[in-house]
Amino acid sequence: MWIANSSSTSPVLAPFIYGTLERLLLPFGLHHMLTRIDTAGVSGISGVPWDAVELPSQFMENWCWEPEALAFISGHYETGEPLPKELLDKMLAAKNYQAALFILRQLEFGLFDFRLHAEFRPDQGAKILETLAEIKKLVAVVPSPSWGRFPHAFSHIFAGGYAAGYYSYLWADVLAADAFSRFEEEGIFNRETGQSFLDNILSRGGSEEPMDLFKRFRGREPQLDAMLEHYGIKG
């Protein structure tokens, strides 16, 4: 994938790195643009609980890895040929390399965030590193060095707006993968499936409970299977 090189005066092309495509689709804005809710406080992403606010953005990334979708948006800059299937398979394998460790790391972050906000008592002093060490014993594969001070740089839960909400990244991954699995079953460009996602997810903003909206779209509560399969982890 390529884009015009705006930093050059010559008519050359600059590579559109694959990660850039993911970043383009991640904050694509459909949740805001397609809202049908007139009340500002619950339209678009406004008023959407942390449990589901990342669902549409992570959902959109799935199209980056579908051959049928890539045929529309990719092409060799000289021949116009779409991305070869064998190259996509290699990219998928690279994406899923050590995916299980990534999931465990996200669980570690989420649990640490929860416990930090649920158990902190100013009069008893902060047990930040002790709390992290306890969590790592539960979920971490590789121990941290004794001099490690990761919590001091965990900006998401202090300055990033995700205090007691970091878990939503991984939970949104579950929701997004499970929602996309319906498209995999019915066709990634199936018009009726897309309309259902618009009617039940994108257009509703924060006007209803996310679980109710998800069940209307998927016909059931979320399941983990699709997310694990997307990461190449199959039982």
Q: Where are the model-predicted features located?
A:
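Cation-handling catalytic/transport regions enriched in His/Asp/Glu
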Residues: 1-235
